[in-house]
Amino acid sequence: MATPNEVSALWFIEKHLLDEASPVATDPWMKHESSSATESSSDSSSIIFGSSSSSFAPIDFSESVCKPEIIDLDTPRSMEFLSIPFEFDSEVSVSDFDFKPSNQNQNQFEPELKSQIRKPPLKISLPAKTEWIQFAAENTKPEVTKPVSEEEKKHYRGVRQRPWGKFAAEIRDPNKRGSRVWLGTFDTAIEAARAYDEAAFRLRGSKAILNFPLEVGKWKPRADEGEKKRKRDDDEKVTVVEKVLKTEQSVDVNGGETFPFVTSNLTELCDWDLTGFLNFPLLSPLSPHPPFGYSQLTVV
């Protein structure tokens, strides 16, 4: 049930909109409609006020009616507005709000629409390894790679390779504060590793870490290896050529004994007689011996 204040407000709005002074009332059709509306509103108001007369006092609507007339109708602009007739078109223009973009605009907004649409995550698998094929000239020969033996690849304990290709073996002696003990130089890394294993087993026993633990007790004696090395060193030495001393026989001028001019052995020199050595002919131009081709000279 509406309150009296709400009913009075509705009645005032209807009177203001459908009154003869309003522009809407100029249209005869609207006037007829307004008259019918006023009659219905008056009937409804009479019914409402008739039913509520017992409980409510009569309401004075003079104040509510006069206030909007003072605000809206006293100004000259409102009078001019009332004097000008208005015509309202009953036809309703229906505008098409469906936006149909052109092909050019559609192409421009396509990336934005696609970016807004969230795509499901993709599972990216790693591509297969690709091998590059290098095309070379027909005359070029492929490089021949020398196969590296397992012996050169593997590093043995206690073995070092020299720059010239030999392999040296050494071990640290725990009894001498970890000082290095030289074990020798070998042609192959396996020989050097076996020499290290033998020395490590002698120093540490069963606690030694060996290169070939299954060969314990099967090592060859190194005496033979020492003899081979010594023989190889002897072959590398330069042999000294001994000079053979020639012997000459002295000429016996006076019919005396002949003595060797130069001896080939020291033993013959020791067996000489001193008297024979003193009688050795002089090799001087003053010598009286004609076989040398010089005549005897006289000193004045």
From Swiss-Prot:
Task: Report the CDD domains cross-referenced here.
Answer: AP2
One short Pfam family name for this protein? AP2
**Induction / repression:** Ethylene induction is completely dependent on a functional ETHYLENE-INSENSITIVE2 (EIN2). Wounding as well as cold stress induction does not require EIN2. Transcripts accumulate strongly in cycloheximide-treated plants, a protein synthesis inhibitor. Seems to not be influenced by jasmonate, Alternaria brassicicola, exogenous abscisic acid (ABA), cold, heat, NaCl or drought stress.
Cellular localisation: Nucleus
| Compositionally biased residues, Low complexity | 35-48
Q: GO MF terms on file?
A: DNA-binding transcription factor activity; transcription cis-regulatory region binding
Q: Region entry Disordered: which residue ranges?
A: 28-48
- Please indicate if the UniProt record lists Transcription as a keyword: yes
Q: InterPro entries recorded for this chain?
A: AP2/ERF_dom, AP2/ERF_dom_sf, DNA-bd_dom_sf, ERF_plant
The highest taxon in the source lineage is Eukaryota
Nucleus recorded as keyword: yes
DNA-binding region(s): which residue ranges?
A: 155-213
Q: Which cysteines are joined by disulfide bonds?
A: none
GO process annotations (BP):
defense response; ethylene-activated signaling pathway; response to auxin; response to cold
List UniProt keywords, sorted A-Z: Activator, DNA-binding, Ethylene signaling pathway, Nucleus, Plant defense, Transcription, Transcription regulation
Q: Where does the UniProt entry say this protein principally localizes?
A: nucleus
UniProt xrefs under SMART domains? AP2
Q: Name one GO cellular component term.
A: nucleus
Annotated family: Belongs to the AP2/ERF transcription factor family. ERF subfamily.
Its UniProt domain note says: The AP2/ERF domain binds specifically to the 5'-GCCGCC-3' motif. The affinity of this binding is higher if the seventh amino-acid of this domain is basic.
Query: According to its UniProt entry, what is the function of this protein?
Result: Acts as a transcriptional activator. Binds to the GCC-box pathogenesis-related promoter element. Involved in the regulation of gene expression by stress factors and by components of stress signal transduction pathways.
In Swiss-Prot or TrEMBL terms, this protein is called: Ethylene-responsive transcription factor 5
**Record organism:** Arabidopsis thaliana (Mouse-ear cress)
Native organism taxonomy: Eukaryota, Viridiplantae, Streptophyta, Embryophyta, Tracheophyta
